Amino acid sequence: MEISIPTTLGLAVIIFIIFKLLTRTTSKKNLLPEPWRLPIIGHMHHLIGTMPHRGVMELARKHGSLMHLQLGEVSTIVVSSPRWAKEVLTTYDITFANRPETLTGEIVAYHNTDIVLAPYGEYWRQLRKLCTLELLSNKKVKSFQSLREEECWNLVKDIRSTGQGSPINLSENIFKMIATILSRAAFGKGIKDQMKFTELVKEILRLTGGFDVADIFPSKKLLHHLSGKRAKLTNIHNKLDNLINNIIAEHPGNRTSSSQETLLDVLLRLKESAEFPLTADNVKAVILDMFGAGTDTSSATIEWAISELIRCPRAMEKVQTELRQALNGKERIQEEDLQELNYLKLVIKETLRLHPPLPLVMPRECREPCVLGGYDIPSKTKLIVNVFAINRDPEYWKDAETFMPERFENSPITVMGSEYEYLPFGAGRRMCPGAALGLANVELPLAHILYYFNWKLPNGKTFEDLDMTESFGATVQRKTELLLVPTDFQTLTAST
């Protein structure tokens, strides 16, 4: 019996529909909840016009704290609650210990050989050990105390030099100070082209935020070129590479003691001794890590702390009173003076709760298929932990959107990721290794800014007028620079 073409097509359509229904029923049994999606771009349209961390938080409130997003070609799971954060960062920590490959990592981080982006494995484990024992140990962080104190003092003098009643760009001054601290820690004092180096790093940080087309469509190499990002990153990287090569070539070796060693000294010593298989590019990748990540995160945290204090005069008065009573007119602040300043530490904790420097932490990647909460998670799935949402979860935080340092009084919660409702530096194996250095670079500068000066908004504005709009880059910064008028409080008698 001959079958007509229309009949054949009809049968084909029926078979196709039945097949799709059957496979949909089968495949979706173990898939995570998700918003509605579009072809090709997946769920990206839900995030247009939003800050990524806020957009993802709003989606999670509708679809659950364990949710799937298809970001272009990249299958992504988003965790937005302490419960699921603890699960993926403890029980499944090794499973999600990898990093997804990115265009920035390929070009800027010397093919992902830095600490942050290196794939999980022996090389990364050795780097982590190097950080723990050498580069970012408590002893090494302590060894940079004198330069922190010196650069904080220089900041005070710079602010004083502007004269009374004149607004200053505090954002610019803070970034410059942190960059100088880290530059001296990394390379020593008086390197050539420090400002050029800092500006290039700043440009990379600006280019690496959000969901980039090159990273959500990794297989579409043509898009990487059409977007212009590959060319921009390559250009900046080449300039940075030349600068670092010159710094290394001119760097004096043979420090007389380990306490005098810069971060570059440590890396070159280990490279030359063959204690660790470091290449010249590995050394440069790690140095860029320390400088880039540290500058942006510390300066942003200080800015947000001051912004929140300006908007909360009660807390500003309380922290300044604590500082001024404890120091009792002391001319120069030392880090030892801050050990018992409890409210200052609460202010920093609360700032990190509301404004974690990396609100989506650093994405991880699933190393092997697993089952999470009864859902099938394929290998290579990207993991985002939205610490911004977790830190503002109303189930765990009363008045979660309010700046209230007192919430941490008599609280066992620390910044080191042991309590999963508060994760400013992440948690688990891939937690930020520079937390101790970052905190040291926040606490002392903030103390100087608050101890020596009173602050107000320019042009008669009140605290309600302060713009708190965010800008998403490598970290979440203020969109507008922080312009404030200093009023001298603590009179200085020394000129040095």
Curated annotation (Swiss-Prot):
Domain of life the protein comes from: Eukaryota
GO molecular function, one term: iron ion binding
UniProt-listed GO biological process terms: sesquiterpene biosynthetic process
UniProt membrane topology term: Single-pass membrane protein
Major location (coarse): membrane
Keyword vocabulary terms for this entry: Heme, Iron, Membrane, Metal-binding, Monooxygenase, Oxidoreductase, Transmembrane, Transmembrane helix
Cofactors that this protein relies on: heme
Matches recorded under InterPro entries: Cyt_P450, Cyt_P450_CS, Cyt_P450_E_grp-I, Cyt_P450_sf
Subcellular location: Membrane
TM ranges: 3-23
Coiled coil: none
Annotated Gene3D superfamilies: Cytochrome P450
Gene Ontology CC annotation, any one: membrane
Record-listed E.C. numbers: 1.14.13.-
Pfam families (alphabetical): p450
Residues that hold heme according to the record: C432
Functional summary from the UniProt entry: Valencene oxidase, which preferentially hydroylates the C2 position of (+)-valencene in the trans-orientation, producing trans-nootkatol that can be further oxidized to (+)-nootkatone. Can also catalyze the three-step conversion of germacrene A to germacra-1(10),4,11(13)-trien-12-oic acid and the partial conversion of the non-natural substrate amorpha-4,11-diene into artemisinic alcohol and artemisinic aldehyde.
Family per similarity comment: Belongs to the cytochrome P450 family.
Descriptive protein name: Cytochrome P450 71AV8
Gene name of the encoded protein: CYP71AV8
